[in-house]
């Protein structure tokens, strides 16, 4: 038995053990920083409202778990300042578990001075490294979406296996205001984004739909695209564009903003099976990332064992559904 296989045995034993069902809580933090002018302030207001409404009405987020920080033009709002961002994430950190999901969406403007990437806030800005430090303290699964110009460096700064990071640009040199946020929010709100028609809209489906819409936006105007969105979830910080080949997208394909199926059933046994299915699917994606680090025979044996167990669990789910 190889050392790699020996290390994998405890993981498989944990996977195959019965899982207790627990309810997933979904959190969202929508941050609008400095508006950059009246035109952008009105635009961000519309985006914030649409995103909040979509998360609550379409995806069933609890209103109290959807936090929006506003630009400086909103009277009486909680502004998107560094202090308020830190406070909001601190509150989530205290209650979020590894089974929960946190969506962070940045709306506004970003900068890159050749060394440091920042998201423009009301008052002092936060760097990509500072965002990573704060978010790494939160136990929940993370979907981080920076919709601004010059957002590309955030991909490298926030990279982590199993963490979904989306940026509106594929280069720090892309410094024009983006249309990606408009189409990202639109993709979230439309039923047609669920391409596989399984009743759940995955993060990958939203990314693909939004990216394609951005491409069409520029093509219809006969303009050269100044933005190309990237998605990274394998932790290499490279990312890939919509339609491109690459390892990224495995976790984003599994993750959705919809409530987990386990939360929709009153059958504890079925809920436990659904949760185990999600765990097995995620572990299969993790194993794919280890393919080059293990002897081929050991990797194949481990993968086949996972697939057999996933098939068994899926069959049990069908019987009890």
Residue ranges and their predicted role:
Residues 20-103, 110, 117-119, 251-259, ...:
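Boundary/activation segment at the start of structured domains
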Residues 34-42, 71-79, 92, 116-122, ...:
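Second-shell loop/turn segments in exported
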Residues 49, 143-233:
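Active-site-proximal C-terminal subdomain of hydrolase catalytic domains
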């Amino acid at each position: 038995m190889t050392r790699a296989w020996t290390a994998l045995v405890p993981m498989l034993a944990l996977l195959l053990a019965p899982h207790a069902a627990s309810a997933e809580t979904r959190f969202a933090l929508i941050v609008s920083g400095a508006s950059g002018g009246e035109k952008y302030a009105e635009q961000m207001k519309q985006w914030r409202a649409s995103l909040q409404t979509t998360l609550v009405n379409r995806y069933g987020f609890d209103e109290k778990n959807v936090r929006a920080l506003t630009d400086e033009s909103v009277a009486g709002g909680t502004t998107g300042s560094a202090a308020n961002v830190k406070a909001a994430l601190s509150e989530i950190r205290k209650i979020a578990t590894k089974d929960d999901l946190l969506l962070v969406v940045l709306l506004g403007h970003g900068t890159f001075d050749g060394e440091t990437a920042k998201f423009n806030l009301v008052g002092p800005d936060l760097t990509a490294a500072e965002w990573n430090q704060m978010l790494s303290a939160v136990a929940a699964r993370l979907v981080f979406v920076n919709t601004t110009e010059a957002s590309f460096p955030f991909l490298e700064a926030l990279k982590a296996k199993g963490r979904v990071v989306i940026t509106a640009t594929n280069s720090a040199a892309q410094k024009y205001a983006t249309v990606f946020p408009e189409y990202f929010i639109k993709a979230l709100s439309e039923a047609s984004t669920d391409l596989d028609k399984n009743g759940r809209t995955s993060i990958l489906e939203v990314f693909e739909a939004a990216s394609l819409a951005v491409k069409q936006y520029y093509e219809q105007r006969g303009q050269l695209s100044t933005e190309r969105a990237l998605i990274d979830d394998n932790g290499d910080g490279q990312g890939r564009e919509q339609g491109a080949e690459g390892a990224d997208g495995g976790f984003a394909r599994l993750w959705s903003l919809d409530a987990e199926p386990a939360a929709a059933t009153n059958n504890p046994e079925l809920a436990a099976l659904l949760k185990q299915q999600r765990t097995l699917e995620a572990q299969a994606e993790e194993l794919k990332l280890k393919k080059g680090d293990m002897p081929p025979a050991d990797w194949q044996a481990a993968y086949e064992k996972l697939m057999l167990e996933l098939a068994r669990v899926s069959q049990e789910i069908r019987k009890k559904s």
